[in-house]
A protein has these predicted regions:
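N-terminal leader/targeting and accessory segments in enzymes
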Residues: 1-79, 330-331, 359-360, 364-378, ...
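Residue-level signal for inorganic ion chemistry
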Residues: 9, 40, 55, 76, ...
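Acidic, Mg2+-coordinating active-site environments of NTP-dependent enzymes
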Residues: 11-16, 166-307, 334, 359-362, ...
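Short acidic-hydrophobic, aromatic-tinged amphipathic segments that line or gate anion-handling sites
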Residues: 64-67, 389-398
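Phosphate-binding loop of NTP-binding sites
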Residues: 69-203, 209-217, 404, 427-433
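ATP-dependent carboxylate/acyl-activation modules
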Residues: 91, 97, 294-298, 419-425, ...
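Active-site beta-alpha connecting loops in nucleotide-dependent enzymes
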Residues: 292-295, 312-386, 391, 433
Length: 434
């Protein structure tokens, strides 16, 4: 972190500031007292006031109990960002933000000193945390921006001030909050309006919902079929091999992910990489160092040569369809088992979307479908071609069903919205000795 004087922290953040003896500045920021390092500023949010003493014992230079946690984090993130000449990339979109961020970070790191959001730090707390990791020599910052309402991306952009924006795949997500996919697009496209003149926006080719928000003074790069960065060929086994046309340059790249849907995320990342002026001919240097965030496309061995695909971080109709495609690609003759939890925030059409995903399981050749959660019952209604279909209202009630139906040698997908906590299922399956 670029150091901040404690006098400035006190001016920026109304509240109670407890300063360690002799401390004059902070060299890091933390909101989890267990992770505090000497010299950090500990910001007490969500009940963190109880841990102020622990943070100081661990060496914090100061502890802040802010009057307004969101405002304090924004002010601190903005203060660090304003001291840096780093180029900031902002990523929005309905699905694929975190994986695209992970791929872009891997591509950039061999060439420029890069800071990227950890996990899915993309809200009013997480984005400033990313910015406070900027060091004096940081050259590129990759900031993820989530949205739960109109105006939120605009506010996050006021803090991060990106010069390059990326909108990932659009689709029916957060409909409970926005009502229509057009309003989802409006929210995600706020990043276009926040870019400076001469900035660059990267977006999916053919995404008509975003076209009304484009500006004459912002450059546009498109990725996907018909775009500036497009996929010519794809194959995968333990690695994905992509042949790409990137701004007229033919690239052959090997990535250490396996799924076709991450190939689309890689195209988006390559477009941003090009917008940063990094050498396309050297993109392979980072391609095999992609480290996807936790609970995304994780593969673990199961008994009898089986495989668990743990993709339980989150879900919407687009990512569910992609995960089922990936299940088929990775099965290699194994029996297909899908454990699917609710897809949250889809609004009044949620039953329709769940039914469509259920139909997709049937088309994919899934032989066992275990649906978990009140909305997940809709999967069963669409999955008429699946041999064994079972539903449980909670994850806990689904565990006995899972143990009764899963056999050695199965290829099993676990996926659902974050609110379902399906990592419990994945951990239970993975705990069975191989």
């Amino acid at each position: 972190m670029i150091p901040l004087a404690l006098d400035e922290v006190a001016c920026l953040c109304p509240g109670r500031l407890v300063v360690a003896p002799g401390a004059e500045r902070v060299t890091g920021l933390e909101i989890d007292s267990r992770r505090v390092r000497p010299g950090d500023l500990f910001v007490a949010i969500r009940g963190g006031v109880e841990h102020v003493g622990d943070a100081l014992v661990r060496g914090a230079a100061a502890a802040l109990v802010p009057d307004d946690a969101f405002a304090a984090m924004a002010a601190l993130g903005r203060a660090v960002r304003d001291r840096s000449a780093a180029r900031v990339v902002g990523i929005t979109g309905a699905t694929g933000k975190t994986s695209t961020k992970d791929i872009l970070a891997a591509l950039c790191r061999p060439h420029v000193r890069t800071v990227a959001a950890e996990q899915s730090h993309n809200n009013e707390i997480g984005l400033p945390l990313t910015l406070t990791r900027i060091e004096p020599d940081t050259e590129v910052v990759i900031a993820e921006m989530g949205t739960r309402g109109l105006g939120q991306v605009t506010e996050l952009c006021r803090v991060a001030r990106p010069g390059i924006g990326l909108v990932t795949t659009m689709g029916p997500a957060h409909l409970e909050l926005f009502g229509t996919i057009e309003r989802v697009a409006q929210a995600e496209a706020e990043i276009v309006g926040a870019l400076p003149a001469g900035g660059t926006i990267v977006l999916p080719a053919g995404e008509s919902l975003l076209e009304p928000y484009l500006r004459d003074d912002v450059d546009v790069l498109r990725y996907g079929d018909g775009g500036d960065v497009r996929l010519l060929a794809f194959e995968a086994d333990d690695h994905a091999r992509l042949v790409v046309d990137a701004l007229g340059e033919r690239l052959e790249l090997t990535f250490n992910f396996r799924s076709r849907h991450n190939a689309t995320n890689a195209l988006a990342a390559l477009a941003v990489y090009a917008a940063l002026g990094l050498p396309l001919a050297e993109a392979q240097r980072g391609a095999c160092d992609v480290s996807l965030s936790r609970w995304r496309e994780e593969e673990l061995p199961l008994a009898g040569g089986g495989m668990l695909i743990n993709d339980c971080y989150n879900a919407n109709p687009v990512s569910m369809a992609a995960a089922l495609d990936h299940l088929v690609e990775r099965a290699r003759g194994r029996r297909l088992v899908a454990v699917l939890g609710d897809m949250a925030e889809l609004g009044p059409d949620a039953p329709v979307y769940h039914g469509e995903v259920g139909a997709a399981t049937s088309r994919a050749g899934v032989e066992v479908l275990i649906a978990l959660g009140p909305l997940a019952r809709g999967y069963l209604e669409g999955a008429e071609g699946v041999g064994a279909r079972l539903w449980a209202p909670t994850v806990e009630q689904g565990l006995p069903v899972l143990h009764a139906l899963v056999r050695p040698g199965d290829c099993l997908l676990v996926k659902g919205s974050r609110s379902m906590g399906l990592e419990v299922i994945a951990e239970a399956v993975a705990a069975v000795p191989v």
